[in-house]
Amino acid sequence: STERLDWTGRGVVIGLSAVHQDTAALTAVMIAATGWLQSLLAAPESDHVPRRVQVLEEIWALLGSERVAKYYQSCQKLARSYGVANISVAHRIADLRAQSDDGTSAAKVSMGILADTQTQILFRQSSDQVSEATEMLGLSTYQAQLLPQLVRGRALWRVGDRTAVVQHRIGSAEWAICDTDQRLNLDR
């Protein structure tokens, strides 16, 4: 695309809800979108813009395509030079495993991305997810025991080799984008 971004604007959202059930369509849209985003991030004029944040929710769905997985891998590796902080969201660690068990190049890239992640924020996981999280993330016995006990809003932060339990506080302005249960609440 020749569409330019206003880097001083509020942000860009690429909504995938219309194609998220169609694997072929999702892959096609993501290949086009990631190519466009990468060219914008690497453009010389992007050197003079404020730092940016790239958030990819339901990262497991995006890592099924080798092209998209490699885009995201390059974004992580070039984050400092692009001035971008990358945030990947997966609601269950098992969702990432589903993308990494088939032995494909995309699966290997996906596991590499996980291994390269320097900051991991883990909210409560059900007991049946803990062994998988422990294996994939290299959790200690203590960290694994904490995961199913975390209360809402509390997370296990792993930054490098340091660990802390952190209470997250969400302001009223942030709640609208953080409340993933809002569609279920009929009172709103």
Model-derived segments and spans:
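Acidic, low-complexity intrinsically disordered tails
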Residues: 185-188
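P-loop NTPase motor domains
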Residues: 1-84, 146, 155-161
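Conserved ATP-driven motor cores of ASCE-family P-loop NTPases powering translocation/secretion/packaging/pilus
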Residues: 66, 73-171
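C-terminal alpha-helical "lid" subdomain
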Residues: 174-178
